[in-house]
């Protein structure tokens, strides 16, 4: 298999795990009380921690495939940004109009929370003015109804940054890249320093948020890591001997850290996300072994290769669509009395399959114009 085919395997893992990740929301943000609320929260944390590599894997795939950038900058921007912009805009509007649509259909307001448990009570007003207010915010940020769109803002930013970063990546040695990754690795600890030691570090203060290692921080490290690991493999023995223990340690920190913060009498959103933070050492420790192990998969079946190739085409559309189905899929799993510990993966299979079928249908019906809807 060529490297692109191997990265298709990584993409399948990333795509499915991001759907799984959003299927944990009805567990981690379970509305109301339940006799088994402790078990519900446990499984939400257990799966939520396990699935944190989903977004880093996407960014690493981007770095592996696009660094260094070979196209002229304006062509690259036109090709990459326009591909995501129109579907992002269309689906953002659809998600934000959903509460209003439910009101027009005479559906109960609580249904909105079944679909989007993260959204809170404001959306249950089923008001056009509320929906239009959310739509007006699209140029600036996502809303409570389309939380998953945060990644598209990030992705557009990465696309804008890639040709600039690429000029350095193309010229420097592997040793220089490793030095950059070392600097990035130090920044991964900053969220914990801010929480447990001081809100400011290395020149950061109330009038300066750009501290000493600011320019090494963020998702650009995952871009470079994906680029670097594209051509630097570990042996299977090294993955088993080093990678799997590394994953286990990263998972333990993520899981027990999340359980610690959610057990506090009161916690902020920043504290809630602290151990789930994508740019953290524990999540990096989980992500690297998955990326390297997935690259080892050698798919020989032509049918599976075609399926993976189709996922590459449909993947962006699946990401756009899937958030509509994660909540209802969990409700279906509960209605079918699937054991609690299996509800998240079962719901994920349903949400993933339905989303994929919808994207295939849109592409078949709309032909070439489907790119404006599902990428």
Describe each region flagged by the PLM.
Residues 3-375:
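Alpha-helical transmembrane segments and their immediate juxtamembrane cytosolic regions
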